[in-house]
């Protein structure tokens, strides 16, 4: 089976649509940005992914669906630093520091998420910014954004 486009996301399905038999493809965060790859579901089904559009995969993306079955993307958990700034000043300080290091980050209402790095952990300790190291799933890829200093 070759998948060339995403058919939706389980987050947008009704409860009755979610009752289909589900197979999952477990991906590493770094694989979410790959348009072309060969994967195997948790039921042993081999799938080729060759996306026509240059989009990143996300947790819950539907790779295949029929009347009774669907194959969705799941994301393996990974080692993260969950940064919990108490003030806007702390948030600005750590965001500036992480930006200078060109580290990709993700944000929730109250947290900044970065992939574990012992140097960032040392920085957080030295700045006194609260954080926890946690194994957690993220819904989308950590992506570097290229730019120039010219």
From Swiss-Prot:
Assigned GO CC terms: cytoplasm
MF annotations from Gene Ontology: nickel cation binding; unfolded protein binding
Transport among keywords: no
The keyword Chaperone appears for this protein: yes
Principal location listed in the UniProt entry: cytoplasm
Intracellular or extracellular location(s): Cytoplasm
Record-level GO BP terms: protein folding; protein-containing complex assembly; urea metabolic process
Keywords, sorted A to Z: Chaperone, Cytoplasm, Nickel, Nickel insertion
Pfam families, sorted: UreE_C, UreE_N
SMART domains: UreE_N
Protein task: Involved in urease metallocenter assembly. Binds nickel. Probably functions as a nickel donor during metallocenter assembly.
UniProt xrefs under HAMAP family: UreE
Family (UniProt): Belongs to the UreE family.
Protein name listed in UniProt: Urease accessory protein UreE
């Amino acid at each position: 089976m070759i998948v060339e486009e995403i058919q939706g996301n389980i987050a947008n399905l009704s409860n009755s649509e979610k009752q289909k038999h589900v197979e999952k493809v477990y991906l590493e965060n770094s694989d979410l940005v790959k348009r072309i790859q060969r994967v195997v579901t948790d039921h042993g089904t081999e799938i080729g992914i060759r996306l026509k559009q240059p989009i990143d995969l996300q947790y819950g993306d539907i790779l295949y669906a029929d009347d009774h079955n669907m194959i969705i993307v799941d994301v393996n958990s990974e080692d993260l630093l969950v940064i919990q700034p108490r003030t806007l000043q702390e948030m600005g300080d750590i965001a500036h520091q992480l930006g200078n290091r060109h580290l990709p980050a993700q944000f929730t209402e109250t947290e900044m998420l970065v992939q574990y790095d012992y140097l960032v952990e040392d920085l957080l300790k030295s700045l006194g910014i609260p954080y926890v190291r946690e194994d957690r799933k993220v819904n989308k890829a950590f992506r570097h954004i290229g730019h120039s200093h010219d």
